[in-house]
């Protein structure tokens, strides 16, 4: 292969990589915007209807925003420096995602304890059902495309962000089951056990993010 062919191949690879980074950027922007809207909506109606699970779900949406911002920052820097080793940027993004998982786990456990302690019953769970259904479809689509782009770029940070979104998908199912369960049984603490299980999952994913970040740090060294 002569020099001209090598330069042409390098240009093609760079263009392909840039296209994938643009997709990752759009996914991060959608994640941030959607979760900001969902978080504000959920917290407002959660407090309005005294539905702790919905309010807690809204706070968890803000955690997803943190992870999305980390990915957004990483992708923008990599788009400006396509030939740079992405490990140093991915390490920071993985740590941000790891912290997001830990915050999510703590928030879920505290919300569950508060639910059980107060034995609180919401006025209505209608908005919880609406938010959960919309969130399930949105999170599923985001997970699908984040995993696809993450694998194509071989980016552990984007794949971990997909796991963060997956945790929110599971939480959406818990919110839906809790809202429907309360509607038909009147038991206010139905979601507590499921929320604790998700908290355990979130903690494990957070720990894995930090382990991968340490691996990236070693590679950088």
Task: Report the location of each language-model feature.
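Alpha-helical transmembrane cores and adjacent cytosolic helix/loop segments
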Residues: 2-221
